[in-house]
Amino acid sequence: MHLLIPAAGSGKRMGAAVNKLLLPLLGQPILAWTLQAADRASSIEWIGILSQPGDWPAIEQILAAMDLSTPVQLLQGGATRQESVYRGVEYLYNLGTVERVLIHDGARCLATPKLFDRCSAALQQVDGLIAGIPVKDTIKVTETGPKGIQIQSTPERSRLWAAQTPQGFRLSLLWQAHREALAQGWQVTDDAALFEKLGWPVYIVEGEESNLKLTTPWDLVLAEQILQQRLELAR
């Protein structure tokens, strides 16, 4: 399975002056933890990192220190996650040999090899899927008015799932979806939303509670605790 990792974001919400994936987490950069999990997944045969050229020297240092068994290629990312994935999908499509692809946020460094393998196996049966977990909290749909944020409705919680990554798709369809998005001016926050706009089915594979997306400094604290616990259990 080919894996694309969007890694071109900034560290603004993390309060960092550099790409947050280069920040240290329990002894190594965040991106290194993500790569380590993907490398240990038996189904992953190639990894493409979508990043800005300015970050390539730092990423190359990370790769040199890790000695991964899976081939890794640096690809230029875009100004947004959507543009980065578009470029990665275009690259793979032009190869003419790739049928399916997984996409995984670089900031989800706690995903396990088992999750990558589970998504890869499920993708052999469907054209689109995402990792996800059932929502535990009651969710409110709101609208901001003159007096503040007002609740408009409460969706039925039993039907709500929190989207994670990896997300996987048949490559030819994902390329078609991204080209349509470019033509129509669609802006989405994940690739599954493009399939939804086109009326194509996307299925859910059970994700992991610990598969956090590191966005704020508090997320770093939680991630360090989770990784520390895993290391202690592995001793």
Swiss-Prot record:
The record's listing under CDD domains reads: CDP-ME_synthetase
> Could you say which EC number(s) this protein's record lists?
2.7.7.60
Q: Name one GO molecular function term.
A: 2-C-methyl-D-erythritol 4-phosphate cytidylyltransferase activity
* HAMAP family in alphabetical order: IspD (MF_00108)
Which Gene3D superfamilies is this protein grouped with? Spore Coat Polysaccharide Biosynthesis Protein SpsA, Chain A
Q: What is the organism field in this record?
A: Synechococcus sp. (strain JA-3-3Ab)
Family as reported in the entry's similarity comment: Belongs to the IspD/TarI cytidylyltransferase family. IspD subfamily.
Q: What is this protein called?
A: 2-C-methyl-D-erythritol 4-phosphate cytidylyltransferase
Q: Does the keyword Transferase apply?
A: yes
State the reactions this protein catalyses: 2-C-methyl-D-erythritol 4-phosphate + CTP + H(+) = 4-CDP-2-C-methyl-D-erythritol + diphosphate
One Pfam family linked to the record: IspD
Which keywords annotate this record?
A: Isoprene biosynthesis, Nucleotidyltransferase, Transferase
Q: Where is this site: Positions MEP for the nucleophilic attack?
A: 157, 213
Q: Which domain of life is it from?
A: Bacteria
Site residues, Transition state stabilizer = 13, 20
| Gene from which the chain derives | ispD
